[in-house]
């Protein structure tokens, strides 16, 4: 039964059904009754396992195929008509050739299965920020996960009306054949196709595929920005809430910052933090010339291992009801879940992420390192009152960060917008090669968008520079590094809630309330301007954390030039002059 008369939608659904040949088609209306019926059906096939209703009400466990447990960058393509529009950081294939290849794989891929039609919205339905999509899938796990991660159902179809302005998404698990696994974006056709995967990041098409890869291209064409950023509201003791966005590569503490709990000395004074978003921000220029942000998602798709009462109590609290856990440990004694880093008490009677009997003493991991929770944002104790706002929140600061042992100081402010774009473009994290003890590879991840930018990274930087010209009141741009180490390799900064001490200085800079010292890199705090009360950090350590090693930075400049070289004439001239200016300052 079609839920819409929109021919742009019904015709496409019919075409895709003729290709995939499902046994039946079910339109998702967004009602709890229909979702409950689907969850019940998935329990019958083992696709979902119901967990302890008393301890984890409305929660389920899902296990993906062992060969299908993460995003696959090597199988992810941007198929723009011209290869140069995809750029050197994306995989590209000619769209015609790719469609042909994909249609061959989709042909009959849903035989004997049901095709579900999911109308979904990124952003609050009916808001200026909202963009709509339809995902076709043969997976109930995808349906119930999309119902958490996005706003779904009949209201979305009503908002689309008879327009052709929506993103088409086709997903089929097919055979789960890793050799024929593709996650493909056709930016000019507003189309996403994902096949032979059942894993979240590849199949919840609203997330990275739409909200970043396709949306970044839409933003370029429509004068807005889709960014891989958290959105955090910081409420000071006067009751004023100020907002920051933050871009961090994976394993750099993004979720912890998004759900930050102020240190005790701050809590006592009345500081509070509010989560607007933990992963994606859509940013538009407001009538006041400021940048306004919304979180287009409706849930959190978080990494489970390491999430604990100590590391991130807010994230853990968000998973206590109506959550889907993927590839974690199942405790057979009380039918709950566990993962490494949750606590020190792994269950004795349990199944690992593959569903095999697990012995917690044999050294094997019970949960997959990339195991996940899909939880409604509304469950989070610190979810912002502005979460459902149609206009979003005004952004005072953009914070970039990476994981560097020695180069980047704890915090510095860029000199201006273009310099800030430069700071974001050189973002990097380094891996430690444990065997040799040497600091290993520096992985550049500009604006944390390397895997998610839907077009040429050089054009993306140009778009940032162009946006700066259109903002009469732009946010100030900062870089942080929570991961500086001493000569023994120990972290010098406590991180977690104590990061608020740095964010306080950042916001003070945005509102002209605190001074700074100019260095070769930009503006840094005076040691006395960071509140260390109760942090356990001495002023000497802080001074060390703020030091700029000119020799290291001159080496860094070489690495940046090598990185920039691959973009050829797509590198904005503003960034070329920023690297020249930085080298000049360092040589003085």
Give the positions of each predicted feature.
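Conserved internal helical-beta-strand scaffold that buttresses enzyme catalytic cores
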Residues: 2-252, 262-588
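Hydrophobic positions on the alpha1 helix immediately C-terminal to the Walker A/P-loop
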Residues: 257
């Amino acid at each position: 039964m079609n839920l819409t008369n929109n021919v742009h939608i019904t015709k496409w659904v019919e075409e895709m059904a003729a290709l995939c040949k499902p046994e039946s088609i079910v339109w998702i209306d967004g009602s709890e009754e229909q979702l409950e019926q689907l969850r019940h059906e998935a329990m019958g096939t083992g696709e979902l396992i119901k967990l302890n209703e008393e301890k984890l009400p409305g929660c389920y466990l899902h296990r993906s195929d062992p060969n299908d447990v993460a995003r696959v960058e090597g199988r992810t393509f941007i198929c723009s008509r011209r290869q140069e529009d995809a750029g050197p950081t994306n995989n590209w294939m000619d769209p015609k050739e790719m469609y042909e290849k994909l249609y061959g794989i989709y042909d009959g891929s849903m035989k004997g299965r049901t095709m579900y039609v999911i109308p979904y919205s990124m952003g609050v339905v009916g808001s200026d920020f909202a963009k709509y999509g339809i995902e076709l899938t043969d997976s109930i796990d995808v349906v119930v996960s999309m119902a958490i991660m996005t706003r779904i159902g009949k209201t979305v179809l009503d908002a689309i009306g008879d327009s052709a302005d929506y993103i088409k998404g086709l997903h089929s698990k097919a055979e789960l054949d890793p050799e024929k696994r593709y996650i493909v974006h056709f930016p000019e056709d507003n189309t996403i196709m994902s096949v032979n995967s059942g894993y979240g990041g590849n199949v919840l098409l609203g997330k990275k595929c739409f909200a970043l890869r396709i949306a970044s291209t839409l933003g370029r064409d429509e004068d807005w920005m889709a960014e891989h950023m958290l959105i955090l509201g910081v409420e000071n003791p006067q009751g004023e809430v100020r907002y920051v966005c933050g871009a961090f590569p994976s394993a750099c503490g993004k979720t912890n910052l998004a759900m930050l709990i102020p240190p005790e000395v701050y809590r006592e004074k009345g500081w509070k933090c509010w989560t607007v978003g933990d992963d994606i921000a859509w940013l538009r220029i407001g009538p006041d010339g400021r940048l306004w942000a919304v979180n287009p998602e409706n849930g959190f798709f978080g990494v489970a291992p390491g999430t604990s009462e100590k590391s991130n109590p807010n994230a853990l609290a968000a998973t206590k009801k109506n959550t889907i856990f993927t590839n974690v440990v199942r405790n057979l004694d009380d039918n709950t879940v566990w993962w490494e880093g949750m606590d020190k008490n792994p269950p004795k009677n349990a199944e690992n992420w593959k569903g095999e009997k697990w012995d917690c003493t044999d050294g094997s991991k019970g949960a997959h390192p990339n195991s996940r929770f899909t939880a409604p944002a509304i469950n989070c104790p610190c979810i912002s009152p502005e979460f459902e706002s149609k206009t979003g929140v005004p952004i005072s600061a953009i914070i970039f960060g990476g994981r560097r042992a020695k180069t980047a100081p704890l915090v510095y402010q860029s000199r201006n917008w273009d310099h800030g774009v430069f700071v974001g473009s050189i973002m990097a994290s380094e891996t430690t090669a444990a065997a040799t003890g040497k600091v290993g590879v520096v992985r550049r991840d500009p604006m944390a968008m390397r895997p998610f930018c839907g077009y040429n990274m050089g054009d993306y930087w140009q778009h940032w520079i162009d946006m700066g010209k259109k903002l009469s009141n732009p946010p100030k741009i900062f870089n942080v590094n929570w991961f500086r180490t001493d000569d023994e390799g120990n972290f010098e900064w406590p991180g977690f809630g104590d990061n608020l001490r740095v964010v306080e200085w950042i916001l003070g800079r945005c509102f002209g309330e605190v001074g700074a010292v100019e260095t070769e890199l930009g503006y840094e705090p005076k040691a006395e301007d960071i509140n260390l009360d109760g942090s356990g950090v001495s002023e000497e350590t802080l001074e060390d954390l703020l030091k700029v090693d000119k020799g290291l930075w001159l080496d860094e400049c070489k690495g940046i030039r090598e990185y920039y070289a691959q973009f050829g004439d797509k590198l904005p001239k503003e960034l070329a002059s920023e690297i020249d200016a930085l080298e000049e300052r360092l040589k003085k």
